[in-house]
Amino acid sequence: MTKIAPSTAVNRYYLARMTAAEHNERMTSREGASEETGVDRKRLQRIEIGTLNPYPEEVLLMADAYHAPELLNFHCSRCCPIGQRTVPPAEKSGLDRITVKFLNALESIKDTDKELLRIAQDGELSPDEVPQMKHLLHAVQGLAAIACEIQIYIDKRSPQIERR
């Protein structure tokens, strides 16, 4: 049996390939994955050991070939400097867990519409309203992360990853 470096054993791209290998024998080796994705074998190795961040196009290829839509969110929210500021990290969760998170998030924004109207009624954001606005933003960002989880859940169950 081949030894796996500790950094590789927890790498999201490697784990996605190994999950894909359960259904596609070619994914058991980097050589086979390279042929399936079009990403060079040595480059895949460096991506999987964590010494190289893949290009977005490579992540798209791997997500499609491995049927792992969660790689898209992972890359954008954790590897891309712009995405780290703008894309909420999402988990690959089951429907029951997503539902509970969604209902909790809805409960947390229950009266935010009234609060937002109160803040916006004069058309200005005063310094004392900034903390309230940040609280509203945090609640909405929580919903955005849950929306990403729902998208991952749907894409994972689709026969083929659909383009939005």
Model-derived regions, located:
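A short, Lys/Arg-rich alpha-helix, primarily the initiator
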Residues: 1-25
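Short, charged recognition helix plus adjacent turn
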Residues: 3, 75-104, 157-164
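The alpha-helix within a helix-turn-helix
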Residues: 17, 34, 63
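Short alpha-helical DNA-recognition segment
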Residues: 21-46
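DNA major-groove recognition helix of helix-turn-helix/homeodomain DNA-binding modules
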Residues: 57-75
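Generic structural signal for well-ordered, non-transmembrane alpha-helical segments
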Residues: 60, 100-110, 134-148
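Acidic, glycine-anchored loop motifs typical of Ca2+
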Residues: 90-98, 107-132
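Mid-protein regulatory/catalytic core that forms ligand/cofactor-binding pockets
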Residues: 117-164
